[in-house]
């Protein structure tokens, strides 16, 4: 009994001694009070600044001037960084550039300046979205120093209709007819293209689907027809995408495969019921046949725009690919003193 008693007293004394030692150690911390939790953190990631409401282009019409907006995520590092411009999907009827924040933030944390840009949609017709996409690239090059961008390393990322747009940016490099607006002395070329369940040929979006779905894509009211021909108005009764195949092919990435292309990452879900997986397969086949650098990822079980595309495995696939192609400098943290004034 005495042995147990002595052991208990000794243990309590040791704990009190240890506690007093820790309290003495923490008393050296400015602002410390007994009972406070103390942690120590080693910085391993950079601060990311967000800028919104940037007007990258102004479209003049007979009635008004329409601004097109861009937002930016900028890692606070010293060296110029590669940039990626995200163009959102929306079936050619919307272009909400606030989407896909998980992907955009992951890219910013990997060391990229990440822009997200809206573009003109139906009832505006082709080539308006392509003109806008190229204008966004030129704007970023023009303001590269302001935003810490390396103008020689600009990639583009898009999903669905945004995937069509970035494919067009990659396949029409050197076709200056699409360069309209400001800063036309700057190149609109891009150094990497990542397309997620994008459209490569407006003439066969429903390839492999049931006959009734393929017939829908021959309607004058379907969005690809509206993109190419515009809506019915006055004497114009509207037109099917099949009514002018030359025009439709000119508005498709598959119609611009003659020149050399930047590296492509193509991703598609095998269960996509909105944009046929054949759209990505045919682009992959064509680029590979032409000897271009292209990677193709089929995501098993993925539908069009479902939650699969927001999971870490998909996001990491995209981040890793852009990292290989554009090589951001992720090893240098910003000077802590340089940011102190912003935190006051």
Regions found by a protein language model. Give the residues of each.
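Short beta-strand/loop motif that positions the catalytic acidic residue
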Residues: 260, 266-268, 272
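Short beta-strand element of the alpha/beta-hydrolase
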Residues: 70, 80-91
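Acidic catalytic loop of the alpha/beta-hydrolase fold
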Residues: 93, 202, 271-275
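N-terminal cap/lid segment of alpha/beta-hydrolase-fold proteins
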Residues: 26-78
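Catalytic nucleophile-loop/oxyanion-hole region of alpha/beta-hydrolase
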Residues: 95-103, 115-151, 308-314
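Primarily recognizes the serine-hydrolase "nucleophile elbow" in alpha/beta-hydrolase
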Residues: 57, 135-213
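Mobile cap/lid helix-loop segments that gate and shape the active-site cleft of serine hydrolases
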Residues: 43-46, 210-256, 262, 289
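Catalytic active-site module of serine/aspartate enzymes centered on a nucleophile-bearing elbow/loop
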Residues: 311-344
């Amino acid at each position: 009994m005495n042995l147990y008693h002595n052991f208990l007293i000794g243990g309590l004394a040791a704990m009190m001694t240890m506690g007093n030692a820790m309290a003495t150690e923490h008393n050296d911390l400015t602002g410390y009070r007994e009972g406070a939790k103390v942690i120590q953190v080693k910085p391993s990631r950079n601060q990311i600044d967000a800028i919104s409401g940037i007007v990258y282009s102004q479209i003049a019409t007979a009635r008004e001037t329409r601004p097109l907006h861009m937002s930016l995520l900028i890692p606070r590092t010293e060296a110029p960084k590669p940039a990626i411009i995200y163009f959102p999907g929306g079936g050619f009827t919307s272009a909400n550039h606030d989407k896909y924040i998980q992907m955009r933030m992951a890219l910013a944390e990997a060391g990229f300046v990440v822009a997200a840009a809206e573009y003109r949609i139906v009832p505006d017709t082709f080539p308006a979205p392509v003109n806008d996409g190229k204008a966004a690239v030129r704007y970023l090059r023009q303001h590269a120093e302001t935003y810490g961008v390396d103008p020689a390393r600009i990639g583009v990322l898009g999903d669905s209709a945004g995937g069509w747009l970035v494919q067009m940016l990659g396949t029409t490099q050197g076709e200056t007819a699409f360069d309209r607006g400001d800063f036309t002395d700057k190149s609109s070329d891009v150094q990497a293209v990542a397309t997620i369940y994008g459209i490569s040929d407006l003439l066969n979006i429903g390839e492999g689907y049931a006959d009734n779905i393929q017939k829908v894509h021959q309607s004058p009211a379907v969005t690809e027809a509206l993109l190419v021909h515009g809506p019915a108005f006055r004497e114009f009764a509207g037109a099917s995408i099949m009514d002018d195949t030359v025009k439709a092919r000119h508005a498709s990435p598959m119609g611009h495969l003659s020149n050399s292309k930047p590296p492509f990452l193509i991703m598609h879900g095998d269960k996509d019921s909105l944009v046929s997986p054949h759209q990505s397969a045919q682009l992959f086949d064509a680029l590979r046949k032409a000897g271009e650098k292209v990677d193709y990822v089929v995501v098993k079980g993925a539908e069009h725009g479902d939650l699969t595309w927001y999971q870490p495995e998909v996001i990491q696939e995209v981040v890793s690919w852009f990292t290989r192609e554009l090589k951001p400098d992720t090893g240098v943290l910003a000077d802590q003193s340089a940011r102190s004034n912003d935190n006051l």
